[in-house]
Amino acid sequence: MPDHSLFRLRILPWCIALAMSGSYSSVWAEDDIQFDSRFLELKGDTKIDLKRFSSQGYVEPGKYNLQVQLNKQPLAEEYDIYWYAGEDDVSKSYACLTPELVAQFGLKEDVAKNLQWSHDGKCLKPGQLEGVEIKADLSQSALVISLPQAYLEYTWPDWDPPSRWDDGISGIIADYSITAQTRHEENGGDDSNEISGNGTVGVNLGPWRMRADWQTNYQHTRSNDDDDEFGGDDTQKKWEWSRYYAWRALPSLKAKLALGEDYLNSDIFDGFNYVGGSVSTDDQMLPPNLRGYAPDISGVAHTTAKVTVSQMGRVIYETQVPAGPFRIQDLGDSVSGTLHIRIEEQNGQVQEYDISTASMPYLTRPGQVRYKIMMGRPQEWGHHVEGGFFSGAEASWGIANGWSLYGGALGDENYQSAALGVGRDLSTFGAVAFDVTHSHTKLDKDTAYGKGSLDGNSFRVSYSKDFDQLNSRVTFAGYRFSEENFMTMSEYLDASDSEMVRTGNDKEMYTATYNQNFRDAGVSVYLNYTRHTYWDREEQTNYNIMLSHYFNMGSIRNMSVSLTGYRYEYDNRADKGMYISLSMPWGDNSTVSYNGNYGSGTDSSQVGYFSRVDDATHYQLNIGTSDKHTSVDGYYSHDGSLAQVDLSANYHEGQYTSAGLSLQGGATLTTHGGALHRTQNMGGTRLLIDADGVADVPVEGNGAAVYTNMFGKAVVSDVNNYYRNQAYIDLNKLPENAEATQSVVQATLTEGAIGYRKFAVISGQKAMAVLRLQDGSHPPFGAEVKNDNEQTVGLVDDDGSVYLAGVKPGEHMSVFWSGVAHCDINLPDPLPADLFNGLLLPCQHKGNVAPVVPDDIKPVIQEQTQQVTPTDPPVSVSANQ
């Protein structure tokens, strides 16, 4: 029969605290209660003194390491909270809320500046704010604070006010995306190999982020055609540093300061590359309902393909996708303007098209202003500066009742443009905005754009609406009409080259994005449509529409059918077609499917098998026909701790054999340590996890779990900026002989930050031991046993027995009571085979004086009579057992 007495004794201190306070203890409760110590079954004549705890809500003066919960939301870190006795009534105790802790509450400025402090400014004076409740929940090691919303800054679920934003720690980052492909032609025997990549290296120093982007391409082709005048080997290689830049957050302004090479991201004007500086309201700092629209890129790959997203020659995103429809939705809302999409198929075909990212109506909360100020010199590809000095500014002012007034100006010596617009929040009907932009251009010589002065106007209307009840969103960001003589800054810069053919010259642009899920009907619809008309050339129309239906057929559950129609046009070439897919479950984590692709002169049909091995790994196999030839392809993807790995292989009868590899990852190094990791957002925000040196600890945060390396470090990448991110240890997958006493952390990080959070993890065996002092007695009840890392690994019972975690051969530990280490124990090496047979451990005193256990610390909860002052800090009392 198991002996439960040891368990009872180990939790006895907290049983007393909970019985005394009813789990939750008000710091300034008034009612008194009485205790009968006879309910405690203790051995011998152990003394119990509960008179100090007869006041409801009383917490013994001392230091407690607690998780602070503000309005049911935990703050990012645990805090050492001091309790001090009341000056007028020592039977009451109060929590010392330091200025650093109060700063995390997100109080309004007028509330924070009127707060009063006690203990020489070290503690918030209690009772100042009406309706505030502060309670101690010792069972959960928590300080629970309730603050009326009227005292707090604007908040949103999972979004924190600026007072809680974390700039992270200093460090070095190096992120990369590498794609390698090899191809062998069956006819002629030609071979081609290509390696392409892009990435970001950078340094974080305090709030500053310094970055450099690179991109590279290597191609090697070997022809076996003796009649080919270009036969033989051909090698092309290129390496470029595409961009140097730096930025930092300005939390007090809810803005971002950027320096170096940049792309003008404007809510009013068309963008272009420049070198200079800007200060702008950062939409990422705004609550989610006020942020911009993140680009959504969709397409259809006929075979396994490499998809490259670029802007003005700079690669923004590159990945490998399997055959079929794809959507890229993780670019972030900081990317705007015209994006160029290039899809390189394994069969050698290339699709290219441009998309114009939709823009949300430029609205602002009433009484607030959003703005952008920029200046510098325009820049061509390759860091070449062109044109003269320019400057510009734009702003949106929330007037009242949902109305916003916005406008801006941009120009240099020979080009000026100005815009004025108005927006309206229609509440349940969405939001709409209308603006007019006028441009004046002075051309000094004959160009493709003409000569002399040109004046023109451009008119734009935008609309956006979320249908929360229907899980859908429609964003309509065009109609835009431009007069023939209207010029953007980019067109003006092109006009400086007299030999250049005129670009742009837009007439009309329509852009619509619609996404809706009819949950009850099991139907989802997605539409992305763009149409451009021009004054001097043919129009272009691009669209992608997906219709999916999920249904059951008899005993077969969760079947699906989807239909995709698409058209992409670029450089007078159009690719259009239709893709159909029917899938059904096959076991718990697998599906079988039929896929057909018809159009653009290439028809194909395949039967596929998809299987998800675990949360991090899946693969896909397809066999079918393409152009009346047999085709076989496979695709494998793994989200590893060190990198995201994608593998592909393709065989097309009589035409080609190919294989591909894609790696996306990075390295992060700080003074706290570092790790290799996977990533998709180059140079983006990340969270460095420290598991106290314990390897193979599974950490869940963003996507599949990552595991700590041999140094106990891991990186959770691609975390959201200015969002409350959470990471936690998967306790079900912890290594054997590892325990986590703290398994959840959270952080709200500024853009590009390297956050740092530490888990309390103990590694080693478990043992039941008995501690004895030199005089044969034992340490007092409630004494703590700590290892050399200051981790509490055990709590002494009333007979000196202790349950130890994290036991290692020959390890040194110390025993603490009254906040002081009194004696040391050394574990045997090797450890005995049976660690639960009452291992006797002598506790050797520290210094020349043997430890003495005085009577006044024998009570279950030690009485401490000293009053806390800033110069005489309270004795430490652990609250984590």
Curated annotation (Swiss-Prot):
Disruption phenotype: Deletion of the operon under classical laboratory conditions does not result in any major effect on E.coli capacity to form biofilms compared with the wild-type strain. It is found in: Cell outer membrane. Induction: Expression is negatively regulated by H-NS and subjected to cAMP receptor protein (CRP)-mediated catabolite repression. Disulfide bonds: none annotated. SUPFAM superfamilies: FimD N-terminal domain-like. GO terms for biological process: pilus assembly. The keyword Metal-binding does not apply. GO terms for cellular component: cell outer membrane. Pfam families: PapC_C, PapC_N, Usher. It is a multi-pass membrane protein. Residues 1-29 form the signal peptide. GO terms for molecular function: fimbrial usher porin activity. Keywords: Cell outer membrane, Fimbrium biogenesis, Membrane, Signal, Transmembrane, Transmembrane beta strand, Transport. The operon is cryptic under classical laboratory conditions, but is functional when constitutively expressed. Belongs to the fimbrial export usher family. Part of the yfcOPQRSUV fimbrial operon. Could contribute to adhesion to various surfaces in specific environmental niches. Increases adhesion to eukaryotic T24 bladder epithelial cells in the absence of fim genes. Probably involved in the export and assembly of fimbrial subunits across the outer membrane. This is Putative outer membrane usher protein YfcU. It comes from Escherichia coli (strain K12). The gene is yfcU.
